[in-house]
Amino acid sequence: MSRKLCTLNFTLSGKQGSLVIRDIQLWSNRPTASKSTSELRGQFIQYVDLAKLPLWVRSTNMNTYRCYSTSATAQAYFKSKLRNANRGIVIELSDKVDQRSQEPAYLIIFREKTELNCFQVDLTMKHEFDGQVTKLKQEIGKTRASVSKEGSIDIIIQQSQQRKIGTKTKVYRNVHINDKRLQFNETLSKLILGGLRLRGISNSITDYQKLYKITFDAAEFTHRDELKRISMGSVEEVSFESLQETVETLLKLFTKS
């Protein structure tokens, strides 16, 4: 028999300020010791591709909770953001920590067919991996400290290998930056062309190319700070939603009669 466990409210932060998604009820089919329902607060972190999540994120015995909401805003938000079956919404809980790892607790909300579900990220394996890596670094440090003068050739070889790896890393970094910029240009171009089609603006119109170009240039200028950071090797990306919002705003401005 299903039982309501808690109600989740989480905050979205954007260019227009903060919006709170309210009244997300979490229900479970498993028996629980507590009979009272609590209220959780959280903060939106990011969208993720469920197919690309590490295997340790979700253990085999983990609870999956059914999500319901009577809030029209929440329903509209999930309908809009979870159209892709593989997409998940990551929420960091403000007043709860993972009991096993003592790190911030995270929920991932996703759609499974017509149902809205969520699960708590299992950080146990990550904590174990981090501990093993730390231990390995300590052991390597002790080994290096005990290297004799006769072993200095190994250090020279290792330094040479590290320089080669550094060169390859630099090349990969430049390729990665170019790929991100190309992806930005392709996404921006598709959004502009789609926006023009939705407005019934045919490419046979005299000013079509001019309208396309000024929209493209204005969007690049709007996101110049993000593009500059990307060119410097930042791992961040200009989100699809942010770029779509920019294009829509510009087209509304440029196509006013």
From Swiss-Prot:
One of its GO terms (biological process) is DNA replication. It comes from the Eukaryota. It holds the Pfam family Sld7_C. Signal peptide: none annotated. Its main location: nucleus. InterPro entries: Sld7, Sld7_C, Sld7_N. The keyword Nucleus applies. The keyword Cell cycle applies. It is found in: Nucleus; Cytoplasm, Cytoskeleton, Spindle pole. It comes from Saccharomyces cerevisiae (strain Lalvin EC1118 / Prise de mousse) (Baker's yeast). This is Mitochondrial morphogenesis protein SLD7. Keywords: Cell cycle, Cytoplasm, Cytoskeleton, DNA replication, Nucleus. Required for the proper function of SLD3 at the initiation of DNA replication. Binds to SLD3 and reduces its affinity for CDC45, a component of the replication fork. Required for mitochondrial morphology.
